[in-house]
Amino acid sequence: MVNLEELSLKRNNMKRTETTFTDISGKRYQVANINEENSESNRIELNRTSGFVIDTKPDDLSHKIEIIIPQSILNNNNNNYESINLYIGSQDAAFNKLDLQLKNIKSILNVGIGINNLFTKENSDINDGFIINYCNVEIFDDVNFNIIEKFDKCFEFIDSNIGGVENNGILVHCNAGVSRSATILISYLMKKLKIPLSLSLEILKSSRPQCKPNQGFLKQLEIFEKELLF
């Protein structure tokens, strides 16, 4: 049986609290009494916010793929790995002119969706003549997307633009630099260096810990590994 008198006593002994909430316009309010209704008269307006979360740590650096191959599987097919000057990053990294210049990145493989190429020949006047060679391959970060059919075009672009006399670098990026770009680079290293999926994935994660192909892409990488017949 509910004791109404006891409940009333507990209610009266409850401590006042301050509840803060934000409306869709970004206004922040505080209601000082837990027993009061959230009416306009009971609100104390606080400083306005942006209405969205502000990223205080922009992910705007390209990460070099540091290739380390165990001596046990080092062979004539993959002993030239030191000349592979590959980078991975998010869309922010593709806009970081200073970082691209410092790392001698001359080509960018854009496998994201809706990301503009900033340093094109058409924009060279406003970028002090800085020009990047681009290739766009639209890939959706969807477990059902057939990413294997995009491999050949991506590999061809990488092979055509990497290295050279100046050891030019290539940045492979998507929107977040986590799933799509990682999958392309994992598959490229598997084929180029004739190394297993597990090692290629380990190399990517050691260079950029955020790398995490979605489950559908991982399944396709397993299929691709079998096709390579190591």
From Swiss-Prot:
Record's GO cellular component terms: cytoplasm
InterPro entries per record: Dual-sp_phosphatase_cat-dom, Prot-tyrosine_phosphatase-like, Tyr_Pase_AS, Tyr_Pase_dom, TYR_PHOSPHATASE_DUAL_dom
The reaction(s) this protein catalyses: O-phospho-L-tyrosyl-[protein] + H2O = L-tyrosyl-[protein] + phosphate; O-phospho-L-seryl-[protein] + H2O = L-seryl-[protein] + phosphate; O-phospho-L-threonyl-[protein] + H2O = L-threonyl-[protein] + phosphate
SUPFAM superfamilies to which the protein is assigned, alphabetical: (Phosphotyrosine protein) phosphatases II
Gene3D superfamilies for this protein: Protein tyrosine phosphatase superfamily (3.90.190.10)
CDD domains: DSP
Keywords, sorted A to Z: Hydrolase, Protein phosphatase
E.C. number: 3.1.3.16, 3.1.3.48
rRNA-binding in keyword set: no
PROSITE patterns attached to this UniProt entry: TYR_PHOSPHATASE_1, TYR_PHOSPHATASE_2, TYR_PHOSPHATASE_DUAL
Enzyme class: hydrolase
Pfam families: DSPc (PF00782)
GO MF annotations, alphabetized: JUN kinase phosphatase activity; protein serine/threonine phosphatase activity; protein tyrosine phosphatase activity
Active site: C174
BP GO annotations: regulation of JNK cascade
Domain Tyrosine-protein phosphatase as annotated: residue spans: 78-230
Similarity remark: Belongs to the protein-tyrosine phosphatase family. Non-receptor class dual specificity subfamily.
Function: Has a dual specificity toward Ser/Thr and Tyr-containing proteins.
PANTHER family assigned: DUAL SPECIFICITY PROTEIN PHOSPHATASE 19
Name of this chain's protein: Probable dual specificity protein phosphatase DDB_G0283417
